[in-house]
Amino acid sequence: YIMSFDLTSLYPSIIRQVNISPETIVGQFKLHPLGEYINKTAPRPSDEYSCSPNGWMYRKDVDGVIPVEIAKVFYQRKEWKNKMMGAKRNQELIKKVLNDKKFGTIDKFTEVNVYEDFSDDMKAELLTYTEECLDKLMFECKHAEILGNTNQLNRKILINSLYGALGNIYFRYYDLRNASAITLFGQMAIQWIERKVN
């Protein structure tokens, strides 16, 4: 069998979950081979701190600046993605009415938030619009979908590129310990899944 797994925003999720940020590092612990952590045979270094596979420990009691900012952008992305999907679903409804070729006489559509799924009243109202009116509404929905997609992709790139920035010596929050903690956590997650599946 061949399987494909997509771990949603893996590195940003690791940063948030472990609270990886320069000001949250508290110290180191004795390392064990990565396989021992995957098999849960390595001793648990600390219950008080989040521990990374590269030996660094992070505070849990205070949110780090990097995880906080990633969370903000992550939720903005989710919001824009939902808007994009709403506009896309609305296009399908309009397309169905256009394909049925049974048009009404109303030539101006009601002001509606095209990012949100059309209400039942709006769905019924679609049947009363002229073809030109439906085309205009379709244009609005397509524009909203493109805007939503652009915004969610921009945020995806922003949060995913932050990991690379952490390993860049010119970045204000550069810290190789953090960059390697994220990488090793990612490797551990993939290897853990591989062992569970196999």
Predicted regions and their residues:
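Conserved acidic
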Residues: 1-198
